[in-house]
A protein has these predicted regions:
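Alpha-helical scaffold domains
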Residues: 1-120
């Protein structure tokens, strides 16, 4: 059986509780599914769930989680840079470096450097 991620997460459009449960799981892959599954919402212009789950995962110890969260933040920024920066300005100093680097990958170089140097 092959289900596309958006088919699965589309079913979560009404009840998002499973995503939050996965985000708090001890299993790395369940936490990663929680954040990557929010791409469905991002593609539909809904960023709130991604940002809530990203906040939950800020202190995660796993590099794969850092990369996934940074990736989803970058996806938000592709659609609404203001929304991404609102989150980053509040949290970039506490974010794991890999997460921050992934999130700001597409920023203009001067702005990227300011984030990396903690000057925002």
């Amino acid at each position: 059986m092959s289900l596309h991620r958006s088919e699965i997460t589309g079913a979560l459009d009404k009840n998002k509780a499973p995503l939050y449960r996965l985000a708090k799981s001890e299993d790395l892959w369940e936490r990663r599914i929680a954040i990557v599954a929010t791409l469905y919402f991002i593609k539909h212009g809904k960023y709130e769930e991604t940002l809530k789950i990203a906040k939950t995962l800020l202190t995660d110890k796993e590099d794969l989680i850092h990369k996934a969260v940074g990736w989803m933040l970058r996806e938000i920024g592709k659609r609404d840079m203001t929304f991404e920066e609102m989150f980053l300005k509040q949290h970039y100093k506490e974010m794991p470096r890999t997460m921050l680097r992934y999130a700001i990958e597409k920023f203009p170089e001067p702005k990227r450097q300011k984030y990396l140097k903690g000057e925002i």
